[in-house]
Amino acid sequence: VSVQIVFVHGIRTSATMWRSQLEYLEEQGIPATAVDLPGHGTRMSEDFTVHEAMHTIDAAVRAAAAHGPVLLVGHSMGGLLALAYVGGAQRPQVAGLIAASCTSLPRGAGLAAYRAIARAVDRLPDRGMWITKRILEATIPEETRSDFAAGGYALDTQDTALGNLATLDLATAVARIRVPLWFVNGQWDQLRVNEPLFRRLAPHAELIVVPRTTHLFTAMRPQIFNAVLRLAVATIEAAQTTGTAAGPIPPEEWE
């Protein structure tokens, strides 16, 4: 029985951000799928809500779990949603979780400042596309540079999605998680701000910091992220073999 991987993209982008990883996993013979969240990619015309985003993740996980243990992988907003999902009141069929570029609680002054900057950029004549293209050209290798934009940018969804993220009780969710968990951040990622808190909430989790990379490290250094995927797959396979796989804390054990 092979480990099944489900990818959840970040804000503004879509499932296409994972093209490099999907290609690599196909070569390795590891089944994988990448979802489009509401308001993004092929679902650009839909309204974004946390409820529908969670339903999307749950449907993909359930479908994958019919074929083997599931490794859930989320980046940025996708990572936050994945943490909330795995640490939620239900016990999803997830055997391991990679939470990339998301060790930050989306609330308070930090979230307000981020939304203000995003709104200011969105008011530019080209809605900030010139800036986005220059940043990608300066930081992302040519072979993965187009992956973030290939499914379109969800500019009309961004502010709504950010506001919705503030409703997540991430501190409670992260503390409940008992499956193998990896926090993976770029060295210069602005969302490392609450990294120490996340490590305290999930002391069993592994922290991997990718040197000389930013928030978009999955595309900056895809080979390193592929190595993290291999590590997670091997860990889940070993746990399945020895029968040591863990799950989220059941409700009766919550403090």
Task: Locate each region found by the language model.
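Gly/Ala-rich beta-loop-alpha elbow adjacent to hydrolase catalytic centers
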Residues: 74-78, 82
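Flexible "cap/lid" loop of the alpha/beta hydrolase fold
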Residues: 84-125
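Short beta-strand/loop motif that positions the catalytic acidic residue
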Residues: 177, 183-185
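Conserved HGGG/HGGXW glycine-rich cap/lid loop of the alpha/beta-hydrolase fold
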Residues: 2-42
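Catalytic histidine-centered segment of alpha/beta-hydrolase-like enzymes
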Residues: 213-226, 244-246
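Active-site loop/oxyanion-hole signature of alpha/beta-hydrolase fold enzymes
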Residues: 31-71, 227
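Conserved alpha/beta-hydrolase "acid-adjacent" motif
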Residues: 190-196
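Conserved alpha/beta-hydrolase catalytic His-Asp/Glu region
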Residues: 108, 125-176
